[in-house]
Amino acid sequence: MAKLTYRGSEYTKFKKFRIKKNDEVICITGKHKGKRGKVLSIDKKRDRVIVEGLNKRKRFMRPTQENPQGGVIEVEAPIHISNVMFYDPKKKKKAGVRVGFETVKGKKVRVSRPDKKEL
């Protein structure tokens, strides 16, 4: 089991996030299992990600000056980061991601675990 670490005002389970913004991910558990989408944002304090097109919720908007009619809109709700996995669009299947070192430039790059190719 992962050790809980203190970050800011809350405890978080994950220190490193292998999934980044604009990555394509696939949901591996829950009612959205098997669906894919692009990561819109990451909440590191709560270990959650917002994925485009997944976990949609209805939000009731009051009339404002910008939106005088108000109404109901659908927005994406956050999903726990353990419920999503990186999706490789080239191979069209899910793939693990690990951080490796690039020897030429000496900086960190992300590589796909099965084929060791840069992402």
From Swiss-Prot:
GO biological process, one term: translation
Record has Glycoprotein as a keyword: no
MF-aspect GO terms: rRNA binding; structural constituent of ribosome
Gene Ontology CC terms: ribonucleoprotein complex; ribosome
PANTHER family: MITOCHONDRIAL RIBOSOMAL PROTEIN L24
Keywords for this protein: Ribonucleoprotein, Ribosomal protein, RNA-binding, rRNA-binding
Quaternary structure, from the entry: Part of the 50S ribosomal subunit.
Function: One of two assembly initiator proteins, it binds directly to the 5'-end of the 23S rRNA, where it nucleates assembly of the 50S subunit. One of the proteins that surrounds the polypeptide exit tunnel on the outside of the subunit.
Phylogenetic placement of the source organism: Bacteria, Pseudomonadati, Spirochaetota, Spirochaetia, Leptospirales
Family statement drawn from the similarity comment of this UniProt entry: Belongs to the universal ribosomal protein uL24 family.
Superkingdom to which the source organism belongs: Bacteria
Signal sequence segment: none
InterPro entries: KOW, Rib_uL2_dom2, Ribosomal_uL24, Ribosomal_uL24_KOW, Translation_prot_SH3-like_sf
Keyword Ribosomal protein: yes
Name of the protein in its database record: Large ribosomal subunit protein uL24
